[in-house]
A protein has these predicted regions:
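Cleaved targeting-peptide boundary
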Residues: 20-33
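N-terminal beta-strand motif that seeds the catalytic metal site of vicinal oxygen chelate
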Residues: 33-44
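Short, contiguous alpha-helical
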Residues: 42-53, 63-102, 141-191
Length: 191
């Protein structure tokens, strides 16, 4: 048995020893991606945009005025709120005055809300596209607190996902499978 183990060990180590004797350096480690923090944040944002827009498209227009109980937003108002919030968060990062389009208060139709949501995401795309790990450390005021720009974009992602969770409830109550549970949509399959 020991002879077999020695033979296996020699077979495994001999080529490595020969390579080292010839002066071949070990393989170089892959270079880390540039701006890994901002790139990851942008990837999350891309997924969040996709599920929000898909939710807006899946819900029939007659359900845009639906709300599960009194005291909460309608499905359409949630979409309008998310669109307004894109401007609020990303204008801070871009150093611009918030356009404050008041979408939640002024848009009610499915077509208008989807268009407004797409416009709001296009506005935010500029903030995510221009972000680097270095520029992400610059401080902006967000809800009265000093916040790194990258943190503000992370809060935007979290806020949007929070409201996606609301939309999931609305869709389930109308027997609509939400995007992240739809095997035809979700890259992970059925959740």
């Amino acid at each position: 048995m020991r002879t077999i183990l020695r033979a296996l060990l020699i077979c495994v180590l001999a080529p490595a020893a020969a390579a080292m004797a010839q002066g071949n350096p070990p393989p170089a480690a892959a270079a880390p991606p540039s701006n890994p923090l901002s790139a990851h944040n942008k990837t999350i944002y891309g997924g969040v945009k996709m599920i929000l827009l898909r939710s807006a498209e899946k819900m029939p227009e007659e359900n845009y005025s639906f709300k599960p109980t009194d005291g909460v937003r309608t499905f359409g108002q949630v979409l309008g709120h998310v669109a307004d919030s894109q401007y609020a968060f990303c204008s801070r990062v871009l150093g611009e005055k918030n356009p404050a389009p008041k979408i939640e208060e002024t848009k009610t139709s499915k077509g208008d809300l989807i268009a407004a949501l797409k416009d709001a995401f296009a506005y935010c795309d500029k903030a995510y596209d221009g972000m680097t790990d270095t520029s992400g450390t610059q401080i902006v005021k967000l809800m009265g607190a000093d916040t790194p720009k990258l943190g503000a974009l992370s809060v935007n992602n979290v806020h949007t996902v929070e409201h996606y969770g609301n939309l999931v409830t609305y869709m389930r109550m109308k027997n609509i499978v939400p995007p992240t549970s739809d095997p035809e949509f979700s890259p992970r399959g059925k959740n």
